[in-house]
Regions:
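Single conserved hydrophobic/aromatic residue that forms the stacking wall/gate
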Residues: 2-9, 13
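Generic beta-strand/beta-sheet core signal
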Residues: 6-7, 26-28, 39-42, 107-109, ...
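Phosphate/diphosphate-binding loops
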Residues: 11-61, 185, 189-196
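Short, glycine-/Ser/Thr-/acidic-enriched flexible segments
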Residues: 20-22, 28-32, 41-44, 55, ...
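N-terminal beta1-alpha1 cap of cysteine-dependent amidohydrolase-like domains
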Residues: 50-204, 208-219, 233-241, 316, ...
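Amide-donor transfer/coupling interface in amidating biosynthetic enzymes
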Residues: 123, 143-151, 190-193, 227-367
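A short alpha->loop->secondary-structure connector
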Residues: 218-228
Length: 367
């Protein structure tokens, strides 16, 4: 941005009349308003020019971060290898009667904080959304909540685990509370019945952690977790990260991924402390061979990458999301639900990732 010569940013901030409640406006032309002051102009060049001094953004970022990088790193350890695959496309047809308004069920656990956004995204796509709160004040509350949850799953077409920090990510790790609920026999039986009848399951962020740690991903069934199973672990930078990432479509072998093209890129919000997908090389090769890797973190050129900041948590083989082998279950770290019109307007790329519309189309049997 070029600061105006006669009245730069520094001048405005030094003036006594500057106060809280002032509004910074970005507009196409000069505002015809008596109290509006022109501060500068946007330019294509990646630099700030203030009082005639040009400062490249890259140098400013380096100066802002490198002094404390040893204590507050913005990059973790880069893994050496990245895999890719080119799975054959698949067609998915819902085995039941066409449903114009599929029912989505979102359980709200202690610590869930993305249920409103997720519900709004599904409603915008044409689904009916039902929620229930899992109350854990007393033992009877838990039992009553689980019974209610069981009935909701039985009547749902889509089961969704939204993002958040269930039970504060305690004890010592994310999603353990949700996993215990999923492994309740009544809940487990209803979830298996849901997928057996062609229903869909989605887990985002904390929900993805629960799907992986319960065995629903990548195995498609609860109770199949072993010491060789993948997991989600603390980010390499050892702290919470919040940014926009570029993710690359790696497969279309799921109703959730209907209409996507392998290699297609999306700009997606991420916000998590434990988003590093950890998997052995042997199992990773199996996931890629099966076409179960849904999305990978991508660099500026659109290629899967192990390097920060594009792969912000250090995920193995750049994996951001995976699907079950039958394609009915999808889990991912990126918050697809957080985008809507007029958000992230200063972010480049395709921010509309049509997972929710794809799920509704599957039940409507749209060809």
């Amino acid at each position: 941005r070029d600061a105006q010569e006669s009245r730069g940013l520094g001048d405005v901030y030094k003036r006594q009349e500057y106060a809280y409640g002032s509004i910074l406006v970005e507009c196409e032309g000069t505002l015809e308003y008596p109290h509006a002051e022109l501060l500068g102009f946007t330019v294509a060049e990646e630099a700030l020019t203030v009082n005639g001094v040009k400062m490249p953004l890259e140098e400013l970022y380096k100066a802002n971060t490198e002094k404390f990088a040893a204590v507050y790193p913005d990059k973790g350890r880069n893994s050496a290898e990245v895999m890719t695959s080119a799975p054959a496309p698949k067609t998915f047809v819902y085995p039941g009667e066409a449903v114009e308004t599929p029912v989505v069920y979102i359980p709200v656990f202690p610590g869930t904080n993305c249920d409103y956004d997720t519900a709004k995204a599904f409603r915008a796509a044409g689904a009916e959304v039902r929620t229930s709160v899992l109350c854990n004040i007393a033992g009877d509350d838990v039992l009553r909540s689980i019974a209610e949850m069981k009935e909701h799953i039985r009547r749902a077409h889509i089961f969704v685990l939204a993002g958040g920090f269930s039970a504060g990510d305690e004890p010592d790790g994310s999603a353990k509370f949700i996993v215990n609920v999923l492994n309740n026999k009544d809940i487990r039986d209803e979830i298996h019945a849901l997928t057996d009848r062609g229903g869909l399951i989605l887990g985002i962020c904390n929900g993805f952690q629960a799907l992986v740690k319960s065995g629903l991903l990548p195995y498609g069934r609860l109770g199949m977790v072993t010491k060789e199973s993948p997991t989600l672990f603390r980010n390499d930078v050892n702290r919470h990260i919040s940014q926009i990432v570029s993710t690359r479509v790696a497969t279309t072998a799921s109703p959730w991924l209907r209409g996507f093209r392998p290699g297609e890129l999306h700009s997606i919000a991420v916000s998590h402390g434990e988003g590093k997908f950890v998997v052995s090389e042997e199992l990773a090769r199996e996931l890629f061979a099966n076409g179960q890797v849904a999305f990978q973190y991508a660099d500026a050129a659109g290629n899967p990458t192990a390097e920060a900041p594009w792969n912000p948590n250090g995920s193995s083989y750049a994996i951001e999301g995976i699907i079950s082998q039958n394609g009915l279950i999808l889990g991912k770290m990126g918050h697809t639900e957080r985008y809507e019109n007029n958000l992230f307007k200063n972010i480049a790329g395709n921010k509309q990732q049509s997972l929710f519309a794809n799920a509704v189309a599957y039940f409507r049997k749209v060809q």
